[in-house]
């Protein structure tokens, strides 16, 4: 355990404005929602990191128009109202877990779309079974694996994520549940979680 860091009290009150860094996790969630929305969405306070750049690159690969200004931490995304412009694409998710899972559910919305997804060596070891099994059970997509089953790389054949009832085991990663929830507003049936209510925990700042 690191040694305690002593904090000296300030001798007088300060009047300053601080700019806190954005969140990688929240930025990638907002990017998916912006792509699903109809029209332009302007994000402020976005975090530009490897993971968020991977998400932006993936959206552009799928035909979405984006404008990024890292100096002002702003991103503009032109959403297509639940439509994905390109029916075929090769997406590299690197080692970005949020991009990997959120994009997989997102792509399942596009009935007839065929997408090849891969990641780096570490991503190929990360769990994807929970999300993929849920999408198959919802008849939203079929998957062809080019390595170990339920792992990257794979080809996603989208059948249209229409919603319905599914059981999600989010113990491996909460991103599995987030991925389904983010895409669910664009389903025709909606989605329902089996089990207790979803608890959202906001850490104290």
Question: Where do the language-model regions lie?
Answer:
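Structural preference for solvent-exposed beta-strand-turn elements
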Residues: 1-205
């Amino acid at each position: 355990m690191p040694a305690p860091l002593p904090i000296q009290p300030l001798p007088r009150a300060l009047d300053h404005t601080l700019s806190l860094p954005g969140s990688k996790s929240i930025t990638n969630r907002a990017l998916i929602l912006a792509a699903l929305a109809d029209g332009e969405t302007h994000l402020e306070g976005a975090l530009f990191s490897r993971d968020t750049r991977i998400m932006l690159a993936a959206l552009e690969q799928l035909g979405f128009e984006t404008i990024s200004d890292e100096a002002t931490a702003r991103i503009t995304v032109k959403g297509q109202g639940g439509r994905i412009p390109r029916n075929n694409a090769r997406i590299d998710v690197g080692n970005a877990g949020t991009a990997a899972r959120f994009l997989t559910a997102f792509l399942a919305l596009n009935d007839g779309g065929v997408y090849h997804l891969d990641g780096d060596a570490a991503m190929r070891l990360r769990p994807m079974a929970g999300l993929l099994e849920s999408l198959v059970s919802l008849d939203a997509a079929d998957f062809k694996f080019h390595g170990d089953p339920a792992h990257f790389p794979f080809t996603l054949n989208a059948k249209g994520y229409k919603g319905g009832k599914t059981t999600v085991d989010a113990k491996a990663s909460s991103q599995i549940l987030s991925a389904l929830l983010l895409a669910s507003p664009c389903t025709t049936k909606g989605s329902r979680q089996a089990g207790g209510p979803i608890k959202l925990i906001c850490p104290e700042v």
